């Protein structure tokens, strides 16, 4: 397979295939000063008790896992995709050589109404979670800090809408990695989204979002989007 010249869109590098319409577009994210291509995004659901409570759900007996494909990576924050979308801000981990090499922050966009219907029917969530453009990321930085000391903030139009600490997770980053590796191969540059704290809500057209990854009151990485 051959690719044309890579095109930068925000923090995402997109390779367009040489045969338009016949080959897929492979999407990449930024890790330090490199562009890397995740093969998959592994997502953890129901990992903060406060979020479970706001969704009127029950604490699961086992870790909840679902997937997003590479095609879910996007740069544009959309308010609508067949139905209104909801934001969920998450601490994100980047895998390399079997270890957590990078950390960032991201948005897991969700078709909440569809997700509710799928849950009620006992069906998988992917149709409401894994659509194109449903995963937005900041630049990833080296994981040189204690992962349990990470926190996130999501600001919308200057108001703090979400805040969460890794210490409040039901499954810590290390526990997530160990549990996943019991049944799943984590390849180089795969991304793990570790779940969202309370405060999720609908995306409004024109709203300005800033997601921050924080350690010891220092901002490690951030990303800005204006919803369309």
Residue map of PLM features:
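Glycine-rich anion-binding loop/nest that anchors nucleotide
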Residues: 195
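Catalytic-core "active-site belt" of small-molecule-metabolizing enzymes
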Residues: 4-191, 199-228
């Amino acid at each position: 397979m051959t690719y044309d010249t890579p095109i930068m869109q925000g923090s995402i590098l997109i390779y367009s295939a040489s045969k338009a319409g016949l080959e897929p577009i492979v999407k990449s994210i930024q890790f330090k000063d490199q562009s890397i291509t995740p093969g998959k995004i592994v997502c953890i659901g129901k990992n903060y008790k406060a979020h479970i409570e706001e969704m009127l759900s029950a604490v699961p007996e086992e870790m909840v896992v679902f997937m997003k494909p590479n095609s879910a990576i996007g740069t544009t924050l959309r308010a609508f995709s067949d139905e209104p979308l909801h934001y969920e801000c998450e601490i994100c981990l980047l895998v390399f050589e079997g270890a957590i090499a990078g950390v960032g922050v991201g948005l897991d966009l969700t078709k909440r109404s569809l997700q509710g219907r799928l849950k009620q029917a006992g069906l998988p969530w992917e149709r409401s979670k894994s659509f194109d453009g449903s995963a937005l990321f900041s630049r990833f930085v080296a994981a040189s800090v204690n992962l349990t000391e990470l926190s996130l903030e999501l600001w919308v139009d200057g108001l703090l809408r979400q805040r969460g600490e890794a210490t409040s997770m039901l499954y810590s980053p290390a526990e997530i990695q160990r549990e996943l590796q019991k049944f799943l191969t984590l390849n180089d540059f795969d991304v793990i989204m570790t779940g969202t704290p309370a405060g999720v809500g609908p995306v409004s057209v024109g709203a300005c979002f800033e997601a921050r990854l924080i350690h010891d009151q220092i901002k490690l990485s951030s990303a800005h989007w204006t919803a369309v």
